[in-house]
Amino acid sequence: MAPYDLTVAGEALTARARFPIAGLEFQRRVVLRQSALVIRETVTNVSGRDRAIGWTQHVTLGPPFLECGTTQFRASATRSKVFDTVFGADDYLEPAAEFDWPVAPARNGPTGDLRVLSTRARSSAYTAHLMDQQQSTAYFVAFAPAFELAFGYVWKPSDFPWLGVWEENRSRVNSPWNGRTLARGMEFGVSPMPETREAMVARNTLFGTPCFRRLAAGRSIEAEYCAICRRTDV
């Protein structure tokens, strides 16, 4: 836990925090523009050495919006890879398999279509996806037919080239999950896999794209992205 400051100026809400162990300062500015939240983040390396960072937005969806076999997903994803090893007790995808979004190789049986949340009674999975680098914007959209509601994010693939899709469907029995949690993470960032910084740096690249970002000592980097929520029946 780190203390943080919140300030309001006009239509903007700004949060700031300092992380002394990591040697980083962080700022997030949020502005509401019509039906979208525009978010600008700034990370500053206040230490005396360069630092490899795995800057990632951990967007996570759950019930009642999230429903097995019903909630639909779309993304500007291209080349993809399943997590290197079995991801939980109920992982149904082939470890380390490479594929093109959205059809992933299953361990025992047919392929898995990542555009629709699994209908399995229990499941767990993690896949990494390279966003289309030929486009000026990257995105994911989740659609809940029961609510006629679409929700998603838009960002620059040059800022965040990766999307990680994490699935937890009543698989983890330990606390706080207790075998009851249904969640799907749509985690866009500079690193494809949930791994240590040492492993991230050792991986270096995937599909010819860097797996982390290097922040020089005393320097800052910025990124801007949008969160959008709209009513729709398709």
Task: Set out the residue ranges of the language-model regions.
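Extended, loop-rich substrate-binding clefts of extracytoplasmic carbohydrate-active enzymes
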Residues: 1-34, 64-66, 203-204
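Short Pro-Gly-centered flexible turn/kink motifs
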Residues: 41, 213-231
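Asparagine-centered strand-capping/turn motif at beta-strand->loop junctions
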Residues: 42-47, 144, 229
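Coil-to-beta-strand transition motifs
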Residues: 21-25, 32-39, 48-52, 148, ...
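Short, structured patches in soluble enzyme cores that scaffold and shape functional sites
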Residues: 17-19, 28-34, 41-45, 55-59, ...
